[in-house]
């Protein structure tokens, strides 16, 4: 199989990531931070090492400003529900993922916030906005948004900035602390190359979020209230130590290879864009230059349903995703709300041969032949 669905989750994982999971489960399976014996301490060390590796990748000074969770959706819910106070005005992008849109819709429906959704949220920014929730790159067109510019605007208007880095962490350089980003959420299982069931959230020093959940943390056990210290305040319950071990190794892999990964992604994205644009009746969405996007390209073939095209590609041994990609307002803005689009997304292991195989298959589908 040719795997081109990396915007959903990355595959394959580096060998170092696979070994980290096996080693943790086979030899270091204790509960981190819950006991004083050597195996528990070793498990806690794995979590700390992963936190430090991710802090290095994000250029964050204090690793304790990074908290772990179940996935990016979990982290976005913590950020939004923890930061939004009664009466706040929240602005987000029409290209945001449902992991942002649905929590905000719930908060707005409950009367807790006022919500504005804009195709160009930076043009809508003003002193009435209390929180801006912005994707670093959207998961449909792959277009990269100007987060640094957004941070400047947010500082100007004394507005909180939440960045959804689901499609960029591990591929693009991230400097949330330096840029002035207040909150930055990411999954561990996409370009960070870790296991599914992992996510992380950077929380700016001094910003106090209301915890999303309460429970055991292994510290301050005499208290019936959540501890104030980070990261324990936001990490109730037993952590996914094997998953966090994989995330740590994935972050280290990205520390070593990120510029190379991005460079190859640019070349392959240019190849994919040029090839698709050369096929009659193929419509490509988003920026037509690779520099302005990550390695995610959505397209349609004539009037064919996106699901049919994806099924034919699957029959040809090529994994892509069709439909609305959990971003219905993005498709509405693109004019593809009825049929969605076919999305091919590159990863660190993608090759020119993979791209060429996809292009040949799409060309066959366009000609009406069996793929």
Regions found by a protein language model. Name each.
Residues 1-371:
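Pyridoxal 5′-phosphate
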């Amino acid at each position: 199989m040719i795997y081109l669905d990396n915007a959903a989750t990355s595959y394959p994982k580096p060998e170092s990531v696979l070994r980290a999971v096996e080693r943790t489960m086979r030899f270091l399976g204790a509960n981190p931070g819950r006991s004083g014996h050597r195996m528990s301490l070793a498990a806690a060390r794995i979590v700390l090492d992963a936190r430090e590796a991710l802090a290095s990748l994000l250029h964050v000074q204090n690793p304790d400003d990074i908290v772990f969770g179940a996935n990016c959706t979990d982290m976005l819910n913590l950020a939004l529900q923890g930061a939004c106070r009664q009466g706040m005005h929240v602005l987000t992008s029409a290209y945001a993922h449902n992991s942002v849109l649905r929590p905000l819709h719930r908060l707005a429906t409950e009367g807790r916030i006022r919500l504005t959704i804009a195709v160009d949220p930076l043009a809508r920014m003003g002193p009435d906005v209390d929180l801006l929730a912005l994707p670093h790159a959207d998961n449909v067109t792959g277009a990269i948004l100007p987060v640094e510019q957004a941070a400047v605007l947010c500082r100007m208007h004394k507005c909180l900035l939440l960045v959804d880095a689901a499609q960029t962490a591990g591929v693009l350089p991230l400097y949330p602390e330096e840029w002035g980003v207040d909150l930055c959420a990411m999954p561990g299982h996409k370009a960070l190359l870790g296991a599914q069931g992992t996510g992380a959230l950077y929380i700016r020093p001094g910003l106090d979020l209301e915890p999303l959940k309460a429970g055991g943390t292994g510290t301050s056990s005499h208290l019936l209230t959540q501890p104030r210290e980070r990261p324990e305040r936001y990490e109730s319950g037993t952590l996914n130590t094997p998953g966090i071990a994989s995330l740590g190794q994935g972050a280290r892999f990205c520390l070593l290879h990120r510029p190379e990964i991005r460079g190859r992604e640019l070349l392959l994205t240019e190849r994919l864009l040029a090839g698709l644009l050369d096929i009659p009746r193929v419509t490509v969405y988003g920026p037509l230059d690779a520099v302005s996007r990550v390695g995610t390209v959505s397209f349609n073939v004539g009037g064919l349903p996106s699901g049919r095209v994806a099924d034919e590609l699957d029959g040809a041994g090529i994994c892509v995703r069709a439909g609305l990609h959990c971003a219905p307002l993005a498709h509405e803005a693109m004019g593809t709300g009825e049929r969605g689009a076919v999305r091919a997304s590159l990863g660190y292991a993608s090759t020119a041969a993979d791209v060429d195989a996809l292009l040949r298959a799409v060309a066959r589908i366009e000609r009406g032949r069996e793929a």
